[in-house]
Every structure is written in C-alpha cells, then in structure tokens.
A protein has these predicted regions:
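Catalytic NTP-binding/metal-coordinating core of nucleotidyl cyclase/transferase enzymes
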Residues: 453-535, 582
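Alpha-helical scaffold within the catalytic cores of cyclic-nucleotide enzymes
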Residues: 490-505, 521-562, 566, 587-598, ...
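Transmembrane alpha-helical segments that form the functional core of multipass membrane systems
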Residues: 347-419
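Catalytic strand-loop-helix junctions within cyclic-nucleotide turnover domains
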Residues: 518-528, 562-580, 599-604, 646
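Non-transmembrane functional regions of envelope-associated proteins
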Residues: 2-244, 295-370
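Cytosolic regulatory/linker segments at or just downstream of nucleotide-handling modules
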Residues: 569, 598-647
Length: 647
C-alpha cells in the first residue's frame, strides 16, 4: 500500500510538471522571449551598409495610388545606373500586368533586365493554380530560372503547405534576374515575427528567402547545404547558422536591431518620392535631390509602408521590438543578420530538458534539506542567478528558456513543501498519539508545537500539585495475579485521566499505583488551586463508581488518598541533553506527596495544605487535622481534610 501511494504521488507530480511545462513553454515563454530580445539583444542600430527606400505616406500624397510602373522604373533606374549600390532588393510581388499602361510596364521590365544586382520578391501560396497544366509549366520555368542548388540532408515528411507560386507577368518574369521569397510567418501563440524562413519548401524543392538570395549573390555562394539543425553557405566567406523546421520552411531566429530615433525603422530610410524626384532631375540635367553617392557600396531594399494612406499599403507586423515593424525593415534585418552572422541561436529540446531536470532536482534537494523559510531564500537566489545567466546569454545572442525552468522549480517547491507539510503533520499526529500514552497530551502539545526550542531549563512558577495513591496496594498485589493488577490499574488510570484534563490539570507521571498531576503549568490557569480541589473531588466520586463495578465483578475494593499543595516550584525540562523530562520539583511537590501519605496516618482521604486552603476556603468545608513541620521553615503548617465542596 505504501509503495502504491508513492507511485501515485510520483505520477501526480509528473502530470503537474508536464502540464506546467506545456502551459509555460507554450503561452508564457514566447512573451518572455520578446522582452529579452527587446531589452538585451536589440542594443544597436542596423548596419549603415543597408538602407531602405520606402513608398511612404509622403510618396502616396505626391503620386496617386495605384502607381504606374514607370515610377518603380525610375527608382530602379536611379539605383541601378546612377549609383554604385551593391544590391537592390524589391520587397514586393508583381503579379498582374498594367492593362491601362503597358508602356509603363515595359519601362520597368527594360530597366531591371540588365540589373544583375536586382532581386525581386515572390510568395508561396496556399491557393491552387486556376489551370493546373499551365501551373505545372510555370513551376518548371520558375525552378529552372530561380532555383539555387541546395544539398538537402533532411527528409521532408510533412504534407505540402503550398500549392502555387506568385504568377509573374511574362515580361516581368523574362526580365527579372533573381528572385527570393518575401513570405514571413508569425508565431502561433502571440502573433509576433520572431524568426524568418530562409528556405521555403515547395513541391519537393527549397527556394531561398529574399535575404538569403541577396546574401548568396553578395557572397558568391557556390553551395548551400541544409542539415537537421543548420544552414551552411559556402562562398567567399563560409556561413553556418542554426535553423529549425517550422510550417513549410527552414527558419532561423532574427537578431533585431534598435530603432532610429523617432522612427519605426532600424535602418536608414529614404522616401521613394525623393528618389523619383532625383531621377527626374538627373534626366532633366539638373542636380538631384539626393546625391547618388549616398548609395555607393550600399545594399538597398525597396518596399511600401504607407500607414496613413488608408489604401491598405501599411506593411507592418508585430516583432519583439515594436508592435508595427515595417516588413521591408524585417527583410533588411534578415540580410543584415546573415552578413554579420548575428542570427539568434537557441538550445536544443534535449538541452532544454536537461536544464529543466537539473533545476527540478535542485529544487527537490532544497525541499529535502531546508525549512520553508530557508528554502524560499535559496529559491530566490537560484532564480536571480538563473535570470542573470539568461540575460548574459541573450546578450551573447543565445536564447534560453527563462520563465519555464523557473516555473518548474517553483511548482516543484510548492509540491515538495506541501507534501512535506502533510507528511510532517501526519508524523506529528502519530508521535502525539504514541507518546501521549506515555506522557501528558498537554506536554506533548507544547513539545510538538515548539520542537525547535526544546532544551534543558525552566522557570519558577506558582502551581498546585496533586498526588493520589491507592490504599493497601501492596497487600492487594500479593493476592492478585499481575494481569489482574494491570487490568485494575489501567481501568483506574483511564477513568481519572479525563477528569484531570477536564480541570486543566496535566498528569506529570504515574508512580506505580500513584499519580502526580500539575495545575497552573504548562496550562496557564489563575484558578489552578480551585480546579485541583474540584478535580480531586471528582476523582473520589469516580472511584466510588468503580468500587460498585468492581464489587459486581468480584474484584477487591480499593480506596485512594489525595494530597494537594500550592506554592512556588521549578517547572521545566530536567535530565540530559539527549533525554529530557518535563516535570515540577521543589518543596511544594514534596509537601504534596507527604500530605497524600498522611492520609494513612489520620485515616482520611483528602488532605490539603494551608496554602491551598487560602484559595479554596470559600468553596469547601474542611476541618483542621494537624500541624506539620516544613523543612527550611520555622513555623509549622496546618493541614486540612476536605469534607465536601459547597460550590
């Protein structure tokens, strides 16, 4: 049964830990990740070598939307033929020809066809091609022109996520020199962009992102290799980045940058209309508004984000650093990461499990060896230490789980201390039940409730001590068998114990056939003398009831004598460091014992001292029996027999 309980407890703990892990890792960890990236990763602005040209609200105010494609042609003509820009990335997808202005379309196509450093965007789509045969032909042409040879060392077992690709107009398809995916995917829990798909899986092949395509061109990549955990790019400079599989692609975590002051962007930005004006000025033989040299050796991203236009041109998504992060800046961030090898790495699931197990075991060790207060102190230190290491890790571009391990530790400690409290409470009850058969329940309560302060020593206190003894016990024991004597004594003691407790008395010890009880300590009672008298009176009544019962059972008749004294005595723990006894000692105790023995001499049953009489004279009829000499005192003390109680 004990083993079964242990197994059930272990299973219950495992379920609690598992549920806690799922809740915290799924719902809370992604949000903590955002905070860590914002505060400890995004500490610097994006590279000066990457700039953005944005179709912003200013551009839409000047040129009515939708734009004629000759406006795009002017931007790319300026960048491609009048600057020394390294690369031009177009964060947009051209899917339909301009039926109203085919001349403008042709101007765009003619502009980009000889720009080998131009990379256009495309999207993988869930929708099916209207005509599957034409779609298959388009896919084949797209693959032949834009696919990068990739060595794939992983098996793709997931179902197809995409069914088609952005369908370029024929002229644009023919003119476009390079293409990369601009598809991004938000996190399923909080809807933030945390990672980016470097490779999109489409119908058995991998296609690169816009940033990866641009990096491959910039770095003269000769081979791209995909493994289970990494993407390896071999070129002028070899690059190896940590990746993970997610919905429809191979992703890596982005290292976000710090925003420019009063800007939504982390890279330097130009308005598209200023570039158009500059191109028109150059064609007119005038000085351009923006000097083309500003873009020398720069990588340029062109995209739209006109949030105030009301035309649906706001291209912004939530990221850890801001609620509306322009999409073109996210694409630029990706390339910036690749160029500077700044992608955020993370620990594997196995490593995370090891960390969690270590911290849970550490929590168990604390629970097993320390009290709740000490354990909480150690827990605080462990949490602060882990947070410090987590912050340091993020500063080094390495993401680790933060809230989940801490939560698992906390859950372990709550479970452990709760279990410990329950077990200790049960053990205390068992100890109290067992030891209560040997010592007073009240003394046991004092010990159990203040276990840490049990030590040698005590105090002086005013108490009343009661001794009760069976008359003629020695001669009776010679006539009865030991088991018969045991039955009588146990029945007698069992009968008087609740009477003593009822009157706030504490049985200090059984001495053969005698019992010694204390009133006033450890139970505080200002009326301890009165209660002792009432207790003795009830004990004598109970013995008379027992006499009738024993007589019917053929057992011998027994009488008891009671002696009570009130005075100052030493109360506390007596003995050695390893074995203590809670008791009361002093002349007050000795006189109470002598009074009980005087009953034999004076043929009485109930004697009290004069000091006790002073407290009970109003509730008892007494007669003076004698005067006795008290050790250490010159005057003799009167002793009284209690005849009856008047109250």
């Amino acid at each position: 049964m004990k083993n079964l309980k242990s197994i059930i407890i272990f299973i219950a703990f495992g379920i609690i830990i598992l549920v806690s892990y799922v809740i915290f890792s799924s719902f809370f960890e992604p949000r903590v990740y955002n905070l860590m990236v914002k505060n400890f990763v995004a500490s610097q602005k994006g590279s000066d070598g990457i700039v953005l040209v944005v179709i912003d609200d200013k551009s839409i105010e000047r040129h009515r939307w939708p734009w004629s494609r000759d406006l795009y042609a002017k931007i790319f003509d300026y960048m491609g033929h009048y600057t020394n820009a390294k690369l031009i990335g177009f964060d947009a997808v051209v899917t339909t020809p301009d039926e109203n202005n085919p001349k403008a379309d042709q101007e765009l196509f003619d502009t980009i066809k000889d720009l080998d450093n131009f990379v256009g965007g495309f999207n993988p789509l869930r929708a099916m091609y209207p005509d599957q045969k034409e779609g298959a032909e388009y896919d084949a042409k797209f693959k032949a022109k834009f696919e990068i040879p990739i060595e794939n060392n992983i098996q793709i077992k997931e179902p197809a996520r995409f069914n088609s690709l952005s369908h370029y107009p024929k002229g644009y398809f023919k003119s476009l020199p390079n293409a990369g995916s601009v598809w991004v995917l938000t996190h399923p829990i909080d809807g933030f962009i945390k990672d980016i798909p470097q490779l999109v899986y489409y119908k058995g092949d991998f296609y690169p992102s816009l940033g990866l395509r641009m990096y491959a061109k910039l770095n003269n990549a000769k081979k791209i290799k995909v493994t289970k955990t990494h993407l390896i790019i071999s070129g002028d400079d070899d690059l190896k980045i940590q990746t993970h599989r997610r919905w429809g692609g191979v992703f890596n975590f982005l290292h976000f940058y710090k925003n420019y002051k009063n800007s939504d962007y982390t890279h330097k930005t130009y308005s598209a209309v200023d570039i158009i004006d500059s191109m028109e000025a150059i064609r007119a033989g005038k000085k351009p508004k923006i000097d083309p040299k500003a873009f020398d050796n720069k990588i340029v991203f062109v995209g739209a984000n006109a949030k105030a236009s009301g035309l649906g041109l706001e291209d912004a998504l939530p990221t850890p650093i801001q609620s509306k992060h322009p999409g073109v800046d996210i694409q630029a961030t990706n390339l910036d990461n690749l160029i500077h090898n700044q992608t955020v790495r993370s620990i594997s699931s196995t490593q995370e499990l090891i960390v969690d197990i270590i911290l849970v075991i550490a929590a168990f060790v604390v629970v097993a060896n320390y009290s709740l207060i000490a354990g909480l102190g150690i827990m605080v230190l462990m949490v602060l230490g882990y947070i410090f290491l987590s912050v340091l890790s993020y500063k080094l571009n390495f993401a680790v789980p933060v809230i989940t391990p801490i939560a698992l530790q906390l859950v372990t400690m709550i479970f452990g201390y709760s279990r410990k409290f329950i077990v200790e409470s049960r053990n205390k009850e068992k100890i109290k039940d067992a030891m209560g058969k040997y010592i007073s329940q009240d003394i046991m309560e004092n010990v159990v409730n203040d276990i840490d302060n049990v030590k040698l020593g005590g105090k002086k206190a005013n108490v009343t001590v009661l001794f009760a003894d069976i008359r003629g016990f020695t001669s009776m024991s010679e006539k009865l068998q030991p088991d018969e004597i045991s039955v009588i004594l146990n029945e007698y003691f069992t009968a008087i114990e609740p009477i003593i407790s009822k009157h706030n008395g504490v049985i200090n010890k059984f001495i053969g056939d005698a019992v010694m009880a204390i009133f006033g300590e450890p139970i505080q009672d200002p009326d301890h003398a009165v209660n002792a008298i009432r207790c003795a009176n009830d004990m004598l009544k109970k013995v008379k009831e027992l006499q009738v019962k024993w007589l019917e059972e053929g057992k011998p008749k027994i009488e008891i004598g009671v002696g009570i004294n009130t005075g100052e005595a030493f109360v506390g723990n007596i003995g050695s460091e390893k074995r203590l006894e809670y008791t009361v000692i002093g002349d007050t105790v000795n006189l109470a014992s002598r009074l009980e023995s005087y009953n034999k001499i004076y043929k009485t049953q109930f004697l009290i001292s004069s000091s006790t009489y002073e407290f009970v004279r109003g509730i008892a009829d007494v007669i003076k029996i004698s005067e006795v000499k008290i050790r250490g005192k010159e005057k003799k003390m009167n002793i009284y027999e209690v005849l009856r109680l008047t109250e």
